[in-house]
From Swiss-Prot:
Gene: rpsB
Pfam families xrefs: Ribosomal_S2
Protein name per UniProt: Small ribosomal subunit protein uS2
Record family assignment: Belongs to the universal ribosomal protein uS2 family.
SUPFAM superfamilies: Ribosomal protein S2 (SSF52313)
NCBIfam families per the UniProt record, alphabetical: rpsB_bact (TIGR01011)
PROSITE patterns documented for this protein: RIBOSOMAL_S2_1, RIBOSOMAL_S2_2
GO biological process, one term: translation
InterPro entries listed in its UniProt record: Ribosomal_uS2, Ribosomal_uS2_bac/mit/plastid, Ribosomal_uS2_CS, Ribosomal_uS2_flav_dom_sf
Amino acid sequence: MPTKFQLEEMLRAGVHFGHLARRWNPKMKPYIFMEKNGVHIIDLKKTLVMAEEALKAIEAIASTGREIMLVGTKKQAKVIIAEQAERAGMPYVCERWLGGMLTNFSTIRQSIRRMNAIERMETDGTFDMITKKERLMLIREKDKLVRILGGIANMNRLPAALFVVDIKKEHIAVKEARSLGIPIFAMVDTNCDPDEVDYVIPANDDAIRSIDLMVKAVADTILEARTLQVEQEVLAEMDEAAEEETAND
């Protein structure tokens, strides 16, 4: 897999800016280069190595056709998460994380089925047979479900992994994934506990450019792995067809 990052690029994106030193988590000490003006500066050489390791693991998962859920509900992350996850064809959560999204997935699936049912009502003539008040109530219900669950509407089973922006904010998602043994990839800022994550990417999880750089690299990696998977499947089918043709001659 070609290198996705350059140190200069990460510097321009502000990946190295951590939190105020007084708000740090001591467990992040190995990833901190220095303190400057009361702010911790992340060691980008370590970020570079660890990000590439994380992307290799993501590539391995995506190449088998399994799904990686992207999670980021903070203001700076939500648009990026939605755009990049949709581009990569992955499930995502960019609004509120509902408790039980992973640990009570069967109930969440019921809500998704309800959302799909209301959408069908809009097109199959059902809305023509109910009152205006009932229509408005159903539309409001659907809009709420779409806003919260739209990113996982096509997810039929638990994801193989999570990629998280800001594990402190998404602590419920992290806790659920850990309880189920689902690997967690994450941008981990200097105020967070890296022990909660399987693949730590020490990085500024507040700056839009930093988030965009990392999430885009994840989406690119998934797309490349999926493309390679399809190519390999086509080649395998061609080889199988050629063998059958040879056997029939």
